[in-house]
Curated annotation (Swiss-Prot), chain A:
Signal peptide start-end: none
Residues noted as binding Zn(2+) 2 in the record, renumbered to the chain: 165, 192, 245
CDD domains, A to Z: DHOase_IIa
GO CC annotation terms, alphabetical: cytoplasm
EC numbers for this chain: 3.5.2.3
Active site as annotated: 318
GO biological process: 'de novo' UMP biosynthetic process; purine nucleobase catabolic process
Coiled-coil ranges from the UniProt annotation: none
Binding-site list for Zn(2+) 1: 73, 75, 165, 318
Protein known as: Dihydroorotase
Record organism: Syntrophobacter fumaroxidans (strain DSM 10017 / MPOB)
Swiss-Prot record, chain B:
Identification of the protein by name: Aspartate carbamoyltransferase catalytic subunit
GO terms for cellular component: cytosol
Organism of this sequence: Syntrophobacter fumaroxidans (strain DSM 10017 / MPOB)
Keywords: Pyrimidine biosynthesis, Transferase
Example of a GO MF term: aspartate carbamoyltransferase activity
Residues binding L-aspartate, per UniProt: 86, 169, 223
Length: 439, 305
């Protein structure tokens, strides 16, 4: 493939498997990008040979073209903790992982609880970002759980949802009011479901492994008690509730039951919750320390079933970068969190290989579903718009090597793991935001 | 059989032969403590650093006496504060100390798993002198040595561990050690103080002290920490002592040769009544004596490399 810097963004992908679940499309087709515009998707695209010379023509057989992936739950750490990640490095990691939009949580320093911070994030994203950044505002001022943040102003300046993620909204009345008030502005409320009294002091999942290691456990009930409360409040208020990072079988069951009753709830999980079990902590490795904690085999199975039957709508990464200062320390003092932007895609594609999800279901979890939850017209391949899509090889074999990640942080428990499936090119806004193809 | 390990981090990873080897060696070294000149030159020129990130008098003194009786040079660094409070990470502290070329670190830390972490980062041997709620292997070894002295064997013994199992590293190390040596272990205490899914460690669990007393060859009483009441694990120390405190009255139903053990320090009148602690079945001070011998054995095995 030849493409000089001055060349326009002209690509012709031949015989790609195009998967766009929003349009119920899963077919082999040619995909044409002219000057960055996604011009055509159809079985055979013929261009006159003189025109063809201006195109990079890519044999895309056995590869997929999907809408630019959306990660609805990341931590970009800017402003405040730029030594862990910045909007520049986080979005670079995103496009390297195949994502073209990331929703960033408000627990920055300062907290994103007002227009000024939301606008700052969007401004930095415009200047330095490699993909779309979707700021999520706080539920409570300063994440302190005492009074509501200004949702109207947050939405007006570009916030797509509200959450106190990282901290539960412990006060049930505040959560009720948040749901009611967010409904006013048609903002989803994202729940970090954790009963802080039940999880207090906890360092890992409560069970045989925590007993054996002598580490304080966090019972599954800490999550489930809060899921039950928030479902009751969503039912009461009729407001849109989204449960973040679901980790337990009980939570999946309750969300499924609520959905079947018509409660306006959606849910996400993260790859580590359907890939890892808590026995990985046997070596006291702080890379596995995350909140909610990695649970047991029955939970992993329930999460997979929940993904397959649609109870869990989305897969987010909860990309939580930490430096060695926070991670390379005694277990109890180590920060919670796992980075995910550059390791998620192969782990999601593993669900396809093991036949838990169809390719279309898998793509939906990271494209149209998060877009629908956030109420955004994204996550689908739009013709005659600037290309926003991901070209990936679902069988690309490689060993996950976090030393090559674009993220500033290295807290990846999948480092060294052989895996398959990788983004080869990510188009954002009509440009190649990332490419693994040789120039 | 030579002891090939670099570190002693816990009893879960040791096999039966290794445990037997340590206990046999401890028995032979115990004799040194009875001599008028209680010192042998075995570890002359070796350096042992006691690194205690948690207050401890008994264990630290026991390790220190053990090291000195083997002629090692010892240094003690004690701090109640965590490394992070000091501003230097624990790893930095260990790296600095390692640059002074010690042979053995004896490490006590409030956080489970910390000795494992340190062991991966130093070429010196690491002996776990108690980590969080995880393991306290030298304590379990001295407990087993004491049982062996009085019962002649561990295989077939029924050992009841009574009290706050959930927070006890002593209990965990004893469970691993005793189970490997063929003993039956019964945990006894209120449900709030028994760790979740304790049966997965191969033990029986009871919540009724009266029922297990007649079955036990050994009753190991654990210290009840007073803060458990604030953590909503207990309504009061008074109620605990009524149901789970070991008294002479309750011991009337015990086997004739029952051994009463306690890792110390004791809360007299809470988990154990004074007449039991000082009574004819108590081997609590034998445990302390054997502690020096066991720690000499560990230092001998790890310090010679």
């Amino acid at each position: 493939m030849k493409k000089g810097k001055a060349d326009p963004c002209n690509y012709l992908f031949r015989r790609a498997r195009v998967i766009d679940p929003a349009r119920d499309l899963d077919a082999v087709a040619d995909v044409l990008v002219v000057d960055g515009i996604l011009t055509d998707i159809k079985p055979n695209i013929d261009l006159p040979s003189d025109r063809l010379a201006h195109f990079a023509v890519i044999d895309a057989s056995e590869k997929w073209i999907v809408p630019g992936l959306i990660d609805m739950h990341v931590h970009l750490r800017e402003p405040g903790e730029e030594y862990k990640e910045t909007i520049a490095t986080g979005t670079m990691a995103a496009v390297a992982g195949g994502y073209t939009a990331v929703a960033c949580m408000p627990n920055t320093k300062p907290v994103n609880d007002c227009a000024a911070v939301t606008e700052y994030i969007l401004e930095r994203a415009r200047e330095q970002g490699h993909c779309r950044v979707l700021p999520v505002g706080a539920v409570s001022s300063g994440l302190e759980g005492r009074s509501l943040a200004e949702f109207g102003e947050l939405k007006g300046s570009g916030a797509v949802a509200v959450t106190d993620d990282g901290r539960p909204v412990a006060n049930s009345m505040l959560m009720r009011r948040a749901l009611e008030y967010a409904k006013n502005f048609d903002l989803p409320v994202i729940s970090h479901a954790e009963d802080p009294a039940l999880s207090e002091g906890g360092l890992m999942n409560e069970g045989p492994t925590s007993t054996l290691l002598g580490l304080h456990g966090i019972p599954k009930a800490a999550e489930e008690v809060m899921v039950a409360r928030d479902l009751a409040l969503a039912e009461l208020t009729g407001a849109r509730l989204h449960i973040a990072h679901v980790s337990t079988a009980g939570a999946v069951r309750m969300i499924g039951e609520a959905k079947s009753r018509g409660v306006p709830v959606t849910a996400e999980t993260a790859p580590h919750y359907f890939t890892l079990t808590d026995d990985r902590l046997m070596t006291f490795d702080t890379l596995y320390k995350v909140n909610p904690p990695i649970r047991g085999p029955a939970d992993v199975e329930a999460i997979k079933r929940g993904l397959a039957d649609g109870t869990i709508d989305a897969v987010a990464t909860d990309h939580a970068p930490h430096s060695s200062i926070e991670k390379d320390t005694e277990f109890e003092y180590a920060a919670n969190g796992i980075i995910g932007l550059e390791s998620a895609l192969p782990l999601i594609l593993e669900l396809v290989r093991e036949k838990t999800l169809t390719p279309s279901q898998a793509v939906a979890k990271v494209s149209c579903n998060p877009a629908r939850i956030l109420g955004l017209p994204l996550g689908t391949l739009l013709l005659n718009q600037r290309a926003c899509m991901t070209y990936l090889d679902p069988e690309f074999y490689f060993v996950l090597d976090c030393t090559t990640f674009r993220s500033k942080s290295r807290n990846c428990p999948f480092h060294g793991q052989p895996t398959r499936g990788r983004a080869l090119m990510t188009f954002f806004n009509g440009k190649v935001a990332f490419s693994r193809l040789s120039k | 059989m030579p002891f090939k390990r670099k570190d002693l981090l816990g009893l879960r990873e040791l096999d039966v032969h290794e445990i037997e080897h340590i206990l046999e060696l401890a028995v032979s070294l115990k004799e040194i403590n009875a001599r008028p000149i209680k010192k042998v030159p075995t570890l002359r020129g070796k350096t042992v650093i006691h690194l205690f990130y948690e207050p401890s008098t008994r264990t630290r003194t026991s390790f220190d006496i053990a090291a000195k009786r083997l002629s090692a040079d010892t240094y003690s660094i004690t701090t109640a504060a965590s490394s992070m409070v000091k501003g230097e990470t624990l790893l930095d502290t260990v790296k600095n100390l390692e640059a002074m070329k010690p042979d053995v670190f004896v490490l006590r830390h409030t956080v489970s798993g910390t000795p494992h972490r340190i062991a991966r980062h130093t070429t010196a041997s690491v002996i776990n002198a108690g980590d969080g709620m995880h393991e306290h292997p030298s304590q379990a070894l001295l407990d087993m040595m004491t049982m062996l002295e009085h019962k002649k064997k561990l295989d077939g013994l029924t050992v009841a561990i009574l009290g706050d199992i959930a927070h006890s590293r002593v209990a965990r190390s004893n469970i691993w050690g005793l189970r490997k040596m063929g003993a039956k272990v019964i945990l006894c205490g209120p449900i709030t103080l028994i760790p979740p899914e304790a049966h997965t460690m191969g033990v029986e669990v009871s919540h009724k002290l009266g029922e297990i007393i007649p079955e036990a060859d050994v009753i190991m009483v654990l210290r009840l920490q007073k803060e458990r009441q604030q953590q909503m694990l207990l309504p009061s120390l008074r109620e605990y002592s009524i149901y789970y405190g070991l008294t002479a009255e309750k011991l009337k139903k015990a086997r004739r040769n029952v051994l009463i053990m306690h890792p110390g320090p004791l809360n007299r009148g809470v988990e154990i009544s004074p007449d039991v602690a000082d009574g004819p079945h108590s081997v609590i001070l034998d445990q302390v004596t054997n502690g020096v011998a066991v720690r000499m054995a560990l230092l001998y095995l790890l310090g010679q490399k």
